[in-house]
């Protein structure tokens, strides 16, 4: 199925590209998320008329994402207190929601879906590097310090 991309999609293309994808991927993911429209003659003409407007909107979204990433990087460290045993093992774990809540409480709005934990949830006290994917092209880093209550 031919679609026109309205946003940058990983491993597929960027704004304005006409790509061929499986019908289910287009129907169930790309179109409902607003990342693509079917490449009909009417949609192609409509897209070409609005191309500059869409590119400007995409640039604004990218600039806003960069600004948020700078704010996250400026925080440097966020401290989270949790119950822990004598050897530094936590009772439970600290996941994406806990980290997102702590960063939001520190003054930067972050969704839990933007938090990336490559090694899984945090289960020990100490300092941990946490990545944030604010936009498909914009990443930020933050140190989370887990202390025992």
Curated annotation (Swiss-Prot):
GO biological process, one term: translation
Signal peptide: none
GO molecular function list: rRNA binding; structural constituent of ribosome
Coiled coil: none
InterPro entries referenced in this protein's UniProt entry, alphabetically: Ribosomal_bL9 (IPR000244), Ribosomal_bL9/RNase_H1_N (IPR009027), Ribosomal_bL9_bac/chp (IPR020594), Ribosomal_bL9_C (IPR020069), Ribosomal_bL9_C_sf (IPR036791), Ribosomal_bL9_N (IPR020070), Ribosomal_bL9_N_sf (IPR036935)
One GO CC term, this protein: ribonucleoprotein complex
UniProt xrefs under Gene3D superfamilies: Ribosomal protein L9, C-terminal domain, Ribosomal protein L9, N-terminal domain
Assigned keywords, A-Z: Ribonucleoprotein, Ribosomal protein, RNA-binding, rRNA-binding
Domain of life: Bacteria
UniProt cross-references to HAMAP family, sorted A to Z: Ribosomal_bL9 (MF_00503)
Function: Binds to the 23S rRNA.
Similarity remark: Belongs to the bacterial ribosomal protein bL9 family.
PANTHER family recorded: 50S RIBOSOMAL PROTEIN L9
Protein known as: Large ribosomal subunit protein bL9
């Amino acid at each position: 199925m031919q679609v026109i991309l309205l946003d940058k999609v990983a491993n597929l293309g960027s704004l304005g590209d006409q790509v061929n994808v499986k019908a289910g991927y287009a129907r169930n993911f790309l179109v409902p998320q607003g990342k693509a429209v079917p490449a009909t003659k009417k949609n192609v003409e409509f897209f070409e008329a609005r191309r500059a407007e869409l590119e400007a909107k995409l640039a604004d979204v990218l600039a806003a994402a960069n600004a948020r990433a700078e704010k996250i990087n400026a925080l440097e460290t966020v401290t989270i207190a949790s119950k822990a045993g004598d050897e530094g093992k936590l009772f439970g774990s600290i996941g994406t929601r806990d980290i997102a809540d702590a960063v939001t409480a520190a003054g930067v709005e972050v969704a839990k879906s933007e938090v990336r934990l490559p090694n899984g949830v945090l289960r020990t006290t100490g300092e941990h590097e946490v990545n944030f994917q604010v936009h498909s092209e914009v990443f930020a880093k933050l140190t989370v310090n887990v202390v025992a209550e």
